[in-house]
């Protein structure tokens, strides 16, 4: 019946005697006891883990693909390119447009089809060459860059 009377303490451990100070450490050495002094956790400059950031990264697991140009930009480039006529009366080709703005013909084809990643330098060159707005608000894309003066 005496087992019922003892309180159960969870996490209680017997304290071991420790040697911490210099004088008691020297006395233990004179007595011939085994001494080991270690610095626990030395060299760890890492702080606690940021669990909020780790959880956010776990939720957002897939990398996002780069954004593409809108179809409005591609249509505006194609219509403005077709409107420009050369000396023979034919419309400008993608290759001719690419050479005039110092770009690859494939870049122009990707831009017109809507597969290209927006390149601000290329869009700026195309805006100046075609005289059509390609950046900015959606309702302004395709409008003349500099309207004709009256």
UniProtKB/Swiss-Prot annotation:
Compositional bias ranges of the Basic and acidic residues kind: 48-70
Native species: Cryptococcus neoformans var. neoformans serotype D (strain JEC21 / ATCC MYA-565)
Similarity remark: Belongs to the MBF1 family.
HTH cro/C1-type domain boundaries: 84-137
GO molecular function, one term: DNA binding
Cross-referenced SUPFAM superfamilies: lambda repressor-like DNA-binding domains (SSF47413)
Role according to the record: Transcriptional coactivator that stimulates GCN4-dependent transcriptional activity by bridging the DNA-binding region of GCN4 and TBP (SPT15), thereby recruiting TBP to GCN4-bound promoters. Involved in induction of the ribosome quality control (RQC) pathway; a pathway that degrades nascent peptide chains during problematic translation. Required to prevent stalled ribosomes from frameshifting.
Keywords in alphabetical order: Activator, DNA-binding, Transcription, Transcription regulation
Gene3D superfamilies: lambda repressor-like DNA-binding domains
Binding region for DNA: 94-113
GO cellular component: nucleus
Residue segments, region Disordered: 36-71
Protein name, per record: Multiprotein-bridging factor 1
Keyword Ribonucleoprotein attached: no
């Amino acid at each position: 019946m005496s087992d019922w009377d003892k309180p159960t303490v969870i996490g209680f451990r017997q304290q071991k005697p420790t040697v911490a100070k210099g004088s008691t450490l020297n006395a233990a050495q004179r007595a011939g006891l085994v001494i080991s002094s270690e610095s626990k956790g030395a060299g760890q400059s890492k702080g606690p883990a940021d669990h909020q950031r780790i959880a956010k990264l776990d939720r957002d697991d897939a990398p996002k693909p780069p954004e593409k140009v809108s179809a409005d930009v591609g249509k505006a480039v194609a219509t403005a390119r077709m409107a420009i006529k050369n000396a023979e009366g034919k419309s400008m080709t993608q290759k001719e447009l690419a050479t005039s703005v110092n770009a690859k013909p494939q870049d122009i084809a990707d831009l017109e089809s809507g597969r290209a990643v927006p390149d601000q330098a290329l869009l700026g060159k195309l805006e100046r060459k075609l005289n059509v707005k390609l950046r900015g608000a959606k309702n302004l894309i395709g409008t003349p860059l500099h309207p004709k003066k009256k």
